Amino acid sequence: MAKSSLDKKFDKIREREESKSFSTKKRSRIVSKFVNNRLAVFGLIIFSIILLATIFAPLLSPYDPMRVDLRSMRQSPSLDHWFGTDNTGRDVFTRVLFGGRVSIFIGLGSAILSALVGIAVGCYAGYKGGWIDLIALRISEIFMSFPQIILVLLLVSITGQSLFNLMAIFILTGWGGMYRLARARMLSLREEEYVQALRSFGLSTFTICYKHMLPNALSPIMVNITLSTAMFILTEAGLSFLGLGVPLNIPTWGNILNVAQDILVLQNYWWMWGPVGVVISVFVLCVNFIGDGLRDSTDPSQQG
């Protein structure tokens, strides 16, 4: 006897549940492929070292990052001050560690929060379609039609300088890319048979979108978050170098670089800006290595 339509739908759900073991094997292959990527592993190791160094900064340096010591102004690197001191005698190594806390918090926090906004809107709009999708798409197009740095500069001049204002601006200008990524994935998945079966059983839109469909889009989302983290860290550094980012009384990698605006410092006191410039470059490079590793390991065309 031929199966009824209801039985076929049950079969689709059952196949979906049975595929979990396959998904576990697939995740194992992804991890194995990532581990075999030397650049990705190298990036992850250096990323972890820098991150842990910033977290445990008080244990690694006896100095206060904001303490002024006029007797130690502009000292070159030594055993007492590994990266030297700045114009007011503050230890540069300490400021790089504590500044990394803020810069990484801004970059990673903005990337994750903008991703959450983009995912929430993109999944719902892509699944439901209609006027909700149209409005969300047009709003994202408005934000993405401007060069991001110009839009950020404009919004900073309106809202003023503060750490959380800058993060809010990054989220506002950065959610569009993740929205379009999530939306495209939902558009391709919503006609799948298992989604139609779930819909026929009366499951809520939230359950279908975020519990059953979203896990299939996590791979490109993770890659996008890593790349956004690097972009936001570089943007913060550039804005703070210009004096338009985080207030100067808060140590960040960009604020430490700010001293390089002085041609005297640029030419004669390389330790005030050189080490932090290297740290920014290495950290962003490692984040990009991690992103490339995630992309390669999750690319279906390269799966064995």
Predicted regions and their residues:
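Hydrophobic alpha-helical transmembrane segments in multi-pass membrane proteins
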Residues: I45-I46, S103-G118, S145-V156, P215, ...
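Glycine-rich helix-loop "coupling/hinge" segments at transmembrane-helix boundaries
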Residues: L155-I158, F170, R185-M186, T235-V279
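Amphipathic cytosolic juxtamembrane alpha-helices at the membrane-cytosol interface
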Residues: R90-F105, G109, G129-L137, R190-E191, ...
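Short helix-capping/hinge motifs at transmembrane helix termini and TM-loop junctions
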Residues: A57-P65, G126-G130, V156-Q161, T173, ...
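Generic hydrophobic transmembrane alpha-helix motif, especially the helices
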Residues: W82, L116-G118, G126-L189, M222
